[in-house]
Amino acid sequence: EVKTSVKKNLILNNQLKKSNSPIVYKQKLKDKNTIYFYNDKKAVQSQIHVLIPGSNMELDERLTSRTFNKYFGSGMSALVFQEIREFRSLAYSAYGVYQVPWYLDGEGYFRGYMGTQTDKTVNAIEAYLGLLRNMPEKPLRMEGIKSGLLQSLVTSKPNFRSLARTARNWKLQGYDGNPNVLYKDNYESIDFKNVVNFYEENL
């Protein structure tokens, strides 16, 4: 009925080309340690970016990544911000997240950042790499993280204007339905051991 109404009331070109959107470019990260320097004489601080290649992600890893990110490096209460800025004053800003692929069968990767004074750059990098190599374990933070993630699902519901586009994207990504249902189940059942396992397998 909708299709008939659209054809009747809108003038559409019958020779429309099929869209290839969205275009997702394959990550091309180095398979060995590589350092790039960009010298800007006007820069007032060091901007440090950290990229670590990952591998194809299973659905369970994708779901767990959000909890890992909240624990490790997403937000002011995460390890990276607390250890780098709050406890050691080595950076103005700092974060680190495991970036999931747009498609379910894609490759993930770790993406980190620090903005710091030039004279603190080396110490900041050493501290950041220390967190990556030996993640501190603070399981008591889990309840607060889980509660916050469950609350975030309430505000992530698409509104009526974007519902059709969002549902289409879910299908294109490879989901059978609303992924928030999967995330809800994951948040309710996840424990700190899952976060540690994710860290050990992906970093």
Short names for language-model regions:
Residues 1, 45-56, 81-192:
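M16 family metallopeptidases and their MPP-like homologs
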Residues 1-56:
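An aromatic/glycine/proline-enriched structural segment found at the starts
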Residues 6-10, 68, 124-132:
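Short amphipathic C-terminal alpha-helix that caps PH/PH-like domains
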Residues 9-17, 75, 88, 132-136:
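A generic secondary-structure signal for well-formed alpha-helical elements
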Residues 35-39, 96-102, 197-198:
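Short beta-strand/turn micro-motifs at beta-sheet edges
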Residues 46, 50, 59-73, 79-82:
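Active/ligand-binding-proximal structured segments within catalytic/core domains
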